[in-house]
Amino acid sequence: MSAPSPEDILSFLTDNTSLTILKFLDEKEYSTQQIASNLEIPLSSAYRKVNKLEQLKIIKKTKIIRKMDGTDESFYTSWIDEVQINFKNNRITCKIKNKEHQDKIVRLWQGFRHN
């Protein structure tokens, strides 16, 4: 998939629900069901927003867990560190700085330290 367009990023930045989800996913990974429950948004809306944010490469799927009923549950975390939007010469440009990739062991250790 190509890089997200500046217009798509601006659309995301002006959507309160998407911003709330991004803030929620900044420090820890959650499933879509957990996002919907904790943020008190309809599950269908959470799925749509999470799907769009993943397509825009704003959040990242971190793991998939197979549940006892045989269904898979995906977990997500914020994938961006910084977004820069510029408007110059009647043109919009966008730069996204992704978070540094951390080894799963490092993330696991950080999870234990914060609990």
Regions found by a protein language model. Name each.
Residues 6-17, 31, 64-87:
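Short, cationic-aromatic polyanion-contact patches
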Residues 14, 23-27:
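Short, locally clustered residues in the helix-turn-helix/winged-helix DNA-binding domain
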Residues 18, 43-44:
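The DNA-contacting recognition helix of HTH DNA-binding domains
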Residues 21, 34-38, 53:
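A short acidic, leucine-rich amphipathic alpha-helix
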Residues 57, 63:
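Glycine-centered, phosphate/nucleic-acid-interacting loop/turn motifs that mediate DNA/RNA or nucleotide
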Residues 81-115:
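Amphipathic alpha-helical dimerization/coiled-coil segments
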